[in-house]
Swiss-Prot record:
Cellular location(s): Cytoplasm
A single GO molecular function term of this UniProt record: exodeoxyribonuclease VII activity
Name this polypeptide is given: Exodeoxyribonuclease 7 small subunit
Enzyme class, broadest EC rank: hydrolase
Amino acid sequence: MAKKSPENASPVAQFEQSLESLEQLVEQMETGELSLEASLSAYERGVGLYRQCQQALEQAELRVRLLSDPAQPEAAEPFDPPSHDG
């Protein structure tokens, strides 16, 4: 079975995949064996992964807030995350 592409994966799967990639990138950078150019490229990729993780966490937090508002339990509804092109 083919692996889902990141664009088609669920937000949770995207978060987990981005976090795993970020952790691997940090490990590579911490070895000190990368050239300056490779380190800069890795850092740039890491910043992008970090932003993806932050965005996924913000969406999850919003979803939890929408679902757990005790003042308006009838207002709980499925969360459709905003689409981000980029």
